[in-house]
Amino acid sequence: MRKILAAVIVFFLVSVNVFAEPFSGVYKTMPSKTTGGWAHVKFGACKENKNFTCGTLIKAFSRDGKAVKNYEHQGKYVVWDMRKEGDKNFSGGKIKDYSDGKVYNSKMEILSKNKIGVSGCVLFICQAQEWSKVK
């Protein structure tokens, strides 16, 4: 009985590890083309569906690198509903550009331990950025 219980516990621990959120951390966005400011986005499991990855804007910076106090979009999703597709790719999600208020279809790719590629597309026109890991 103990061996069966031990096997079940080991299986459960391995299963949790396999399905654990594969992508997390805080990333610095590229500077905005319109304002020159950038943000720190914290990635993790979405609150609404833990199987998807979301990115929350946790801090905004002005062109000169100073933190923007009481930024109106702080705490909101920038990226949401990303589904894991293979080891390094995510798709099916959305990304919001708060400088113009538009929402785009989005994909992400883990480029290295400290960089991700994020793209937003309308039809077949896409724009991509590389974001660097902060934490």
Predicted regions and their residues:
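Short, solvent-exposed mixed-charge patches
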Residues: 134-135
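Short, exposed beta-strand-loop hairpins at the edges of beta-sheets
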Residues: 97-99, 105-128
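Central antiparallel beta-sheet cores of small beta-barrel/beta-sandwich binding domains
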Residues: 23-99, 103-105
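Sec/Tat signal peptide C-region and signal peptidase I cleavage site
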Residues: 15-20
